[in-house]
Amino acid sequence: MKQITGIYSAPSQHWVGDGFPVRSMFSYQTHGQQLSPFLLLDYAGPYVFPMGNNKRGVGVHPHRGFETVTIVYAGEVEHRDSTGHGGVIGPGDVQWMTAGAGILHEEFHSESFTRSGGELKMLQLWVNLPAKDKMTAPGYQSITAAMIPTVTLGKGAGKLRVIAGHYDDVSGPAHTFSPLNVWDLQLNHGRDITLYQPEGWTTALVVLEGEVIINGSESAREGQLAVLSQSGDALHLEATTQTKALLMAGEPLQEPIVGYGPFVMNNKTQIAEAIRDFNSGRFGQI
């Protein structure tokens, strides 16, 4: 059994641009190797925006050395980047962007969501790239809700969406550079499930709604992060109410993590190179 090593409550909300009120559930500055290959998770919302005419969001900014995974639960987000990719993602959709050697992108509320207003609820997860892949070509995976397989869990426990990795013989659509699982969980009140992750893997659970008892001992509720030991291969979850959560698990990279703002590399020299390349326009343009 994977043991609980900590349960952490989200800090107070802060704004990213004028469109994303986020709670930073963790970052590599706070958890580092403990959550490798995952670097950061921002939980935006739930927040109700009024109707408007001007798109809210965050303007053009760079990334290098990792991937950003945006999962939308309510509202719509529009993306554009320097590779020429772009589009709108809505409830259930996922955008998996590989920054790699360098990318510029912008993220705003979609035009229709701006006009209508309503609830925004989404996550952005940063996934580190192995050292050998940090300078891979930037890329973009647009994963619609219809592309993501949903598994009905046994004994009426609920449902599980396989965004990346595998659950039993079901595979998620996302291509990844290292072995990992990203699962959306919907657990029914009073039901329980045992989930398995490989021995030695990082495992963490973010509760988005409701409350869950982990391994029969400690509870995690909305806005909390539960981190489990790399040792062991199972965790037991019991929902005390209707619960939604994101489960992340992956093989630790066991490589140095050196970050500066939107760049995450393996040493300071590489960070300096990233800054120079960005300032000299080598990340392209939108």
Where are these regions (language model features)?
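Jelly-roll (double-stranded beta-helix
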Residues: M1-I286
